[in-house]
From Swiss-Prot:
InterPro entries associated with the record: ACP, ACP-like_sf, PP-bd_ACP
Name used for this protein in its record: Acyl carrier protein
Similarity-based family: Belongs to the acyl carrier protein (ACP) family.
Posttranslational modification: 4'-phosphopantetheine is transferred from CoA to a specific serine of apo-ACP by AcpS. This modification is essential for activity because fatty acids are bound in thioester linkage to the sulfhydryl of the prosthetic group.
Function per UniProt: Carrier of the growing fatty acid chain in fatty acid biosynthesis.
Gene Ontology CC entries for this record: cytosol; membrane
Alphabetized UniProt keyword annotations: Cytoplasm, Fatty acid biosynthesis, Fatty acid metabolism, Lipid biosynthesis, Lipid metabolism, Phosphopantetheine, Phosphoprotein
PANTHER family, per the entry: ACYL CARRIER PROTEIN, CARRIER DOMAIN-CONTAINING PROTEIN
Source organism of this protein record: Arthrobacter sp. (strain FB24)
Domain Carrier: 2-80
BP GO annotations: lipid A biosynthetic process
Subcellular location: Cytoplasm
Residue numbers bearing the O-(pantetheine 4'-phosphoryl)serine modification: S40
Amino acid sequence: MASNEEILAGLAEIVNEETGLATEAVELDKSFTEDLDIDSISMMTIVVNAEEKFGVRIPDEEVKNLKTVGDAVSFIANAQA
């Protein structure tokens, strides 16, 4: 089970690979759409890559609830527990 810091670092890498954003820009309080300017197609790619990286399943109906990076970190941490 990964720590929240490890999950954040992993998500930052995934976001960087998909969007080119610096990993340092990916912070817990950042909104995927408003702050990081991630569109729905990129978000789905990020979700699929996060599922593979962390060994969790993020149902499609949950993706809309992942507004911030912190929401995603919490969801992944709980899914791994």
